[in-house]
């Protein structure tokens, strides 16, 4: 399985705080400053007219950032488009770090907060990462390891959101809260 075409979506903690028009000037400012590490920021596209669509898209050479409205759950989504020379765990870690950097900037610039206890990981390549048990089994070990690295040892429960092979492989990541007595 090729892991470079993966994405992560952090859901907005308060969906009503997401006003799509506010993100256009923010993303243009990011392009002017080129402030996302390891990304050549290129353009902004407004898809706010599309119901439950990609919202506002920030295009970079290496991946796309979007204020996504999919499934009626607003959030920040980052899709990596280009491969790296990194191991699968390191590559996934880099994807999370890129999305986390963008989320921190948005929390500062747009005053929107993101839920880091529940999010999804999407394989954006049906050919090389089909939505089946084998691909999910191959993705789980590096994904779990990357999550532990990025979220400082936290455990996450990973489940497929759909068994429909026509859908992209989407993994729900839910932070496991330890019960201390």
Task: Describe these PLM feature segments.
Residues 13-25, 86-90, 130-135, 179-180:
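Short, conserved charged micro-motifs
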Residues 1, 58-59, 65-72, 111-115, ...:
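Short glycine/proline-enriched loop/turn "hinge" motifs that connect secondary-structure elements
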Residues 5-6, 114-133:
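Short glycine-rich, basic-tinged beta-strand/loop micro-motifs
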Residues 126-154:
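Short, hydrophobic/π-rich interface segment
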Residues 22-30, 84-109:
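Ampiphathic alpha-helical segments that act as solvent-exposed interaction surfaces
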Residues 11-66:
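N-terminal low-complexity, intrinsically disordered segments
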Residues 159-181:
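C-terminal edge-of-domain segments
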Residues 61-90:
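Intrinsically disordered, low-complexity regulatory segments enriched in Ser/Thr/Pro
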